[in-house]
Amino acid sequence: MKDIPGIDEHGNPKNGPFELYFKNGLVSCQGEFDNGKKSGEWKYFLNNGQMQSSGSYKDGKIVGQWTWFFKNGQPRGTGGFDDDERKHGIWKRYHANGQLWDEGRFEHGKKKGTWKVYNDDGTLLKEQTFK
């Protein structure tokens, strides 16, 4: 979720599809600008071409569901954001071997309900409840 200016080299707001490239020629990120603000789905990549993260923006703000990936392509985590860019909804993170690491729910940036933490073989290590 790199900080990419929404203004072009002439001081005008960017509009339409956008791609940024690494020195090796591979795509670093791709998405769309609407009047200088990130909009819709954006994808970010590592310099080997592997996807690093993907998710949505609305009026330049991070919103909706996002997914992050390990270098091996396995999911690193998933989670959502509300319209104020606060964590919201079910969040999950994974160990590098693909096993679930932790899971729980956010409500507008605050942990709520039962959160569970697992070791890398899937065994439940801890449960904690947030109000």
What are these regions (language model features)?
Residues 1-131:
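Glycine/tyrosine- and acidic-biased, solvent-exposed loop/turn segments at the edges of beta-strands
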